[in-house]
Amino acid sequence: MGKTILVAGAGHGGLAAAADLARKGYNVTLLEQKAEDALGYDWTDIFAPDALIAAGVPYPSKSLYTYKDNMTFFPPAKSVALTQRVPDNEREIKMERSDIYAHLIAHAKRCGVKFRFETEVTAPLLLGSRVCGVYAGEEKLYADLVIDACGLDSPLRTALPDVCGVEREVGENNVAYVYRAFYARTGDYTPKHNYEVYLLHGGRKEVAWVATEPDFADVLIVRFEPFGTEEADKVVAELRATDPHIGDTVVRGGQFAKIPVRQPLSMLVADGYAAIGDSAFMTVPLIGSGIANALKASHILSETVVADKACAFTAETLWRYQTGYYKLLGTGYAAMTCLKNACLTMEPAEVDFLFERGILTEKEVTITANTTNLQSMMKLSMKEFVERAKKLCTDKILLTKIVRIASQIASATALCAMQPKVWAPQSVRKWAASYNAFYARQQK
């Protein structure tokens, strides 16, 4: 086999993996359907900066980023405000999406990656069960390894045959549909909290935030089913009741996006194929942040590719990427998905109860892109645990739900621990089937 690698899509993890592999002597070409200057949404994004170091990417200029403000969370009744207390050494940085892409692309070019922009990848090119390249329209492009960084609706992952063993569909309640816009500020009202997050906003399966900047209000709306501009406008009108500084004029954004919020793929690899980033569902399930995870995964993938001295790039030789990712991040997010699924079944009154009785505190809402497992969220002393358990026992129905969630989290963790450490086709397929079935049951 050779050392020709195609990266499909300019996802953050794909860009970082391409750069690292090109720097190590591989012939890497990245294909992206958009023009170079059209990448990214017209808004900012946040991520953990240490992920850049993990991926071998230099820090951006200090002029390109600021540090994210702590979020303040409100239950449906807005009766309690819980503000994050993120330690200074764990604060995330905020950058323009376009600047993030420009930084990663410039780095990849310096490392020797070749780019073909405005080239749409439409399907995998197969030789039996092996991915041997991609179709770009009618054009066939061959490679020894294809890295899928095409995102949530990847035309590669969704077209792989069953024999590859890779899930094609995202699954019900596993997509966050997002509307985001920056509205010009109006009036002289200044909110008490700069970054407000409303849970089950309006009593719906909806999260909304209002992040106040000097000249605009950054509004984001998240639902778990598609919605349009008319619905978004109604929600913004509701938000003005508590945040009257949200003006009528959209100065930036006004766009919709889709984000996977679920457990990682059960199979990240197949012969000649590896998925990364949103293509592999690598976001933090509770908040949808995925840039840092994709960057960290890129390093694991690069190390795995380099370790394959024969450049066979089979599912067997790529399996180290899968086990490495699950060890570092995947197991924690698989367990966290159980909590996300349970949150979607919560009633507004139950969320109010958790806030108002002090069962949820500032500790638990201090979730960042560095929150890789539930243990890092639940830093309770035994005394705190007992006190909160007593409060929870006053609501028997909610207590039953919490016990069920705890059982599911334990099962997910145990299931991930059973993932085969060494490639064995039958064992791997059996494990993947059990993993997929476990989460399918939670959707019923």
Give each language-model segment a name.
Residues 8-10, 22-41:
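Glycine-rich FAD pyrophosphate-binding loop
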Residues 121, 227-305, 310-323, 327-328, ...:
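FAD/FMN-dependent oxidoreductases across multiple families
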Residues 1-11:
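Beta1/beta-strand and adjacent pyrophosphate-binding region of the FAD-binding site
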Residues 37-74:
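N-terminal FAD cofactor-binding segment of flavoenzymes
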Residues 86-106, 224-231:
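Short beta-strand to alpha-helix junction loop
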Residues 107-245, 281:
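Predominantly flavin-linked oxidoreductase catalytic cores and closely associated redox partners
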Residues 14-15:
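N-terminal Rossmann-fold NAD(P) dinucleotide-binding loop
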Residues 306-444:
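C-terminal helical "tail/cap" subdomain of flavin- and related membrane-associated enzymes
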